[in-house]
């Protein structure tokens, strides 16, 4: 079997604000735990609204690109109140749109209901976050994305991507060598991120994209989508 190390985060009460120094340092400890974790299980009480403290913790998860599972606890009580999984999922998406890709588990911790599913989800996102993609495959996907929806001109200049490569895992980190990073609009980068999430085994984990200017002849040479098929990089 597999072993897991659980890092609890005592000292943070899910109130609308941090009431005192003890709770403040509890929040700091929780943020440090998020940085250490391979996977975060972010718990919400099905009987309460999402609090300011919840939002602060999720901000830390987003900032650190830590894989996470959103966990709605006390689900037995929610069922009794005729709450549905779809309604709670929509509530989470509306509140944390930046984590709309993260899986959601509905559990009752007191009885262990759906605990196995929660563990399986944690294992799944851990596996996804550790995947490595060959440079050839990555470049073919980016090339197709640029063909389908070219980045628009900005300041009368054409954004160009020369090649893409994955440089790290936990989180999956992809470097795009380009002419000028500032030419790529936020909306186009979101589009590319969506394509990568759809085409690669990173559907439920954060993907970190780094735009880097190519050193030297930044404005010269063919862009990725201008290369013929035979010139596509195939190495890992």
Which positions does each model-derived feature cover?
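C-terminal-of-GTPase-core extension/linker across diverse P-loop GTPases
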Residues: 1-7, 11, 15-28, 32, ...
């Amino acid at each position: 079997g597999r072993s897991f190390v659980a890092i609890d985060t005592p000292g943070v009460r899910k109130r609308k604000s941090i009431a005192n120094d003890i709770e403040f340092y509890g929040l700091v400890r929780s943020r440090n735990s998020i940085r250490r974790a391979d996977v975060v299980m972010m718990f919400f009480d099905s009987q309460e609204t999402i609090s300011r403290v919840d939002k602060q913790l999720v901000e830390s998860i987003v900032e650190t690109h830590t894989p996470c599972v959103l966990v709605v606890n006390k689900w037995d009580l929610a069922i009794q109140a005729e709450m549905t999984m779809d309604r709670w999922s929509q509530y989470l998406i509306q509140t944390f749109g930046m984590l709309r890709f993260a899986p959601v588990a509905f559990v009752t911790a007191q009885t262990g209901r759906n605990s196995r599913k929660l563990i399986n989800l944690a294992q799944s996102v851990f596996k996804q976050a550790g995947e490595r993609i060959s440079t050839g495959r990555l470049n073919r996907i980016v090339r197709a994305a640029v063909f389908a929806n070219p980045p628009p001109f900005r300041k009368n200049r054409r954004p160009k991507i020369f090649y893409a490569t994955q440089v790290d895992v936990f989180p999956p980190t992809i470097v795009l060598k380009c002419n000028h990073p500032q030419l790529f609009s936020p909306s186009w980068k979101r589009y590319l991120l969506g394509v990568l999430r759809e085409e690669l085994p990173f559907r439920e984990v954060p993907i970190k994209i780094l735009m880097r200017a190519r050193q030297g002849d930044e404005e010269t040479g063919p862009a990725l989508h201008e290369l013929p098929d035979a010139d596509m990089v195939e190495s890992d």
